[in-house]
Each structure stands twice: as C-alpha cells, then as structure tokens.
Amino acid sequence: MRALGLVVEYNPFHNGHLHHLTQAKQQTGADVVVAVMSGTFLQRGEPALLSRWYRAEMALAAGADLVVELPYAYSVQTAERFAEGAVTILAALRCSVLNFGSEKGEIAPFYALAEFMNDHQVAFNHHVKQFLKDGVSYPKASAQAFSMLSGHEKLLPLDQPNNILGYHYVKAIQRLGISMEATTTLRIQAGYHDKEFAGPIASATAIRKALLSGENIETAVPAHTARLIQMYKRRYRLLHTWEHYFPFLQHKVLTTPLAELAKTAECSEGLEHRLRDSLFSASSFQGWLSATKSKRYTQTRLQRLFAHLLTGTTAEENAAIQQSGPAYIRLLGMSETGKTYIRENKKTFSLPIVTRQGELRRYGQAGEQELRISQCYWLPLPPQALKQEVTREFQQKPINWEKRS
C-alpha cells in the first residue's frame, strides 16, 4: 500500500484542509493517508481550540486513514524542528510520499531552494548572527540574510509560512537521508494568516476569529467539523485560548525565582525580567503579550515561551528529548484502511506504536513530558471536570472511525 504523509494541525479542520487532503491523495495515487498532527499545543505556541481527539475525528471523517500525534518537543518549535519531528514519524510509518500545500503547487522550486541553502548555509548563518546583533527577531534576521544571499536569483521567498514549512520538509528528508518523495498541492483562495472570513474557503486564522466571536462558520467547514465544535462547546463550555490559561501563567511567573524562569525553553537574554515586569501592567493575556512583545521578541516566540512556562518545559529537557529523535508513535485514530495498513506493516515500522496514554511511561523523559503536557491542557476546567478529563485520557483508546460513524 502506498502511504501518503501529511503534516497537520487542523485547528480546526476546514474546507481548505479537505481540498488539500482529497487532492493530495488523488495527485499521489496513495492507498492510505497518514496525518501526523500536533496535539495539545501548536507550532506557533497556541493551545489547540479543541482536544486532539476531536480534531483527530475531524480528520478521519474527512478521509484520513491514520492520525498520529506529533510530540510536544517537536510541535511547539521552530519550523525546522517541527518538520524534523514530523518527517521522522512519517518515515517510521513507511510513508513513501509527503505532500504539503503551497501557493504555486510546484515542487521544483522547493528542491531548488534546499539546494541553494545547502550551498550557502555557512554564509546564511553568519549573516543571521549579524542581523540578530542589530536587535531584530530571528524570522526577520533569516529573511534579511536570505535576501542578501539570493540577490537576483529567482528563488521562493522565505518570508511566507507555507514556503518556510515546505522548505523545511524537503530539508528534513534530505538531512535525515530518508527515502521519501516530497510533493505539493496548490492551495486555493485563503492565505495562511488571512483574517477575513468570506466564502467556503477561509483560513484557520479567520475561522478561529469568527468562532471566538460567536459567528456561524458552517459555510467554511465540513458538516462533521461543525457538529464536533458544537459538541465540544456544550461539553466543556469553552474553546481553548490563551486567556483561559492566563491565571496559571500569572501564578507561575510571580512565584518562580527568576533564575528558574530563565531555564524555561525559549527564555534567553534576560527575557525572564521582561516577562515579570510587563505582567504587573497587564490585566489579560493579550495585554501581557502586547506589553512583552518587541522588535526582537515576536508574538510566535513569546507564545511558545508561554506554552513552555505553563507546562514547566525547560530548554535542557527539550534538548535531551530531541537529541535521540521521536521515541514512539502515538496513535490517535484509524479507519478500516488504516487498521489494515498497521496490521500488514507494523513489524517493519521503525518506532513502536502507543495506543494508551499509560504506555508513555515506558519512554522515559519523552513520555513523562507528554503526560505532563496532556494534563496541563485541561487546567481551565473546573476541578471535578479536570479530574474526569485527566482520568479519561488514560482510558481513551484510538478512535476506530467506522465503528463511530
């Protein structure tokens, strides 16, 4: 069976995602679609609106055959680490082809960009360091260094989210020496961060904004997604946003010694002082974020730092986990086709499959981190509901889609 790998967040799953999944499967001639999905916290440092289980079901309802989780040590990371973790897991599941959405739908420019960057990596790193000394953020320093090196060459710009991720998928495949073909599918209409909500195709950013404003989003998402969102809101009386976690972050920053705060992943250059000082003038998470943000510290970097603060994740812990790569594959859900694929190929997978949360304890620091992060996600719930969800996480089996439909 030819397995297609997709790297996703589905926050939430919308019509643009459905188009990508359908077209990617058709374009690659795949027999099985494997989605590796961020779990509770996402690449840009945001809590997922809905739990991994609801989002996994959205994917299965739309045609994914296997949904597995991208561990926290890779999901709340730079594009490079994010891509490396995802590609490693897809390779472990014997995916022979990876597909991602892009503005032009052409893969050749991504390979050309990867080749150019391989040839100029030393000079690129040097220029990035020089620009960082000027006090700009890492993304801006990278974009400026790339612009300086590329000159008049017709290369993909490295200042668009989909280009950055696509480039890093190709780079990860090459760096890890994996036998996997990278392909890309043309994105339709809405851009990655478009904030306007109009028509059947809207960005996840616009859909989240509409959802949190109480607007109807049914024209922009599959019917099953809309039903699951309503079910989630009725059950938990929230969609997870940073505002729900603000009191816990306040407590953490105000009661933790500065020397300990400085050990948090993404916290460097005395940022712990800025976090505490700006907190005194903030009455909301957004107020705190605005007061802390600067030319050097972008919203994305700060949000990742906040995720690490909330979950007690240190730079040392992440480095230790990443050093040996993903240790297991956490299975969230499967279709009948996915189940058949696992049965026929399980012995050749290069990583073990985990089907219950309790099994994570076998995987040392990586497993313990995931257990902690999973519990932190439910902190906004009232005490009794929090206890129920933490218990439920240990009882939850992978979703068997046909049996639920």
From Swiss-Prot:
GO CC, any one term: cytoplasm
Catalyzed reaction equations: cytidine(34) in elongator tRNA(Met) + acetate + ATP = N(4)-acetylcytidine(34) in elongator tRNA(Met) + AMP + diphosphate
Enzyme Commission number(s) of this protein: 6.3.4.-
Localisation: Cytoplasm
Pfam families cross-referenced by the UniProt entry: HIGH_NTase1
Gene Ontology MF terms: ATP binding; ligase activity, forming carbon-nitrogen bonds; tRNA binding
Positions of ATP binding: 7-20, 101, 162, 187-188
InterPro entries attached to this UniProt entry: Rossmann-like_a/b/a_fold, tRNA(Met)_cyd_acetate_ligase
Keyword line: ATP-binding, Cytoplasm, Ligase, Nucleotide-binding, RNA-binding, tRNA processing, tRNA-binding
Gene Ontology biological process terms in this record: tRNA modification
UniProt function note: Catalyzes the formation of N(4)-acetylcytidine (ac(4)C) at the wobble position of elongator tRNA(Met), using acetate and ATP as substrates. First activates an acetate ion to form acetyladenylate (Ac-AMP) and then transfers the acetyl group to tRNA to form ac(4)C34.
Similarity comment: family membership: Belongs to the TmcAL family.
Protein name as annotated: tRNA(Met) cytidine acetate ligase
Species in which this protein is naturally found: Shouchella clausii (strain KSM-K16)
Origin organism lineage: Bacteria, Bacillati, Bacillota, Bacilli, Bacillales
